[in-house]
Amino acid sequence: MDQSLANGVGGASIERNTTETRIRVAVNLDGTGVYDVKTGVGFLDHMLEQLSRHSLMDLSVAAEGDVHIDAHHTTEHSGIAIGQAVAKAVGDRKGIQRYGHAYVPMDETLTRVALDFSNRPYLIWKVSFSRDKIGDMDTELFREWFQAFAMAAGVTLHVECLYGENNHHIVESCYKALARALRAGIEIDPRKRDAVPSTKGTLGGSL
């Protein structure tokens, strides 16, 4: 998947090994939403599958982590690796729309996500839960994943659940809204295919 595609952004792969996790990620940003996700954390797999399906990003994740302790390292490190792969795939960010946003309803829940491929990573997270766990995951870990993804991908990311009651619906709408915003942000602008979407001629400063 580590290739540049003629009509879009392209693909990339990342391998990230630490004493806590071993993770291999491949993405194709010009895909159709095909996924193969195995993190060892069932609910995280479910969320990453939603990310792939609704962004149309093909996503392969193979992770081995210290889940006998808890899911923290696998969750955070998968966010880092996916973010790194996305950043590698978009490269110098020439031709992309850069900005993306989405509102996603899920029954009683409504979530808004806005992002900027600014190369100035930042996360605003306005999401709260009424339970400590969803499935096999601590709810506090979802912020860790979004933080890790934003930092590694080099995106400014705002995630806000406007209202909702069901905790599963809340977090799933966050991933689906991220997916739709990501899809919009990486879309190629045919009028500016060879231009970086910034008056500076480059994006970022800290990365």
Curated annotation (Swiss-Prot):
Keywords: Amino-acid biosynthesis, Cytoplasm, Histidine biosynthesis, Lyase. One of its GO terms (molecular function) is imidazoleglycerol-phosphate dehydratase activity. GO terms for biological process: L-histidine biosynthetic process. It catalyses: D-erythro-1-(imidazol-4-yl)glycerol 3-phosphate = 3-(imidazol-4-yl)-2-oxopropyl phosphate + H2O. SUPFAM superfamilies: Ribosomal protein S5 domain 2-like. It comes from the Bacteria. Its EC number is 4.2.1.19. One of its GO terms (cellular component) is cytoplasm. Belongs to the imidazoleglycerol-phosphate dehydratase family. This is Imidazoleglycerol-phosphate dehydratase. The lineage of its organism: Bacteria, Pseudomonadati, Pseudomonadota, Alphaproteobacteria, Rhodospirillales. The gene is hisB.
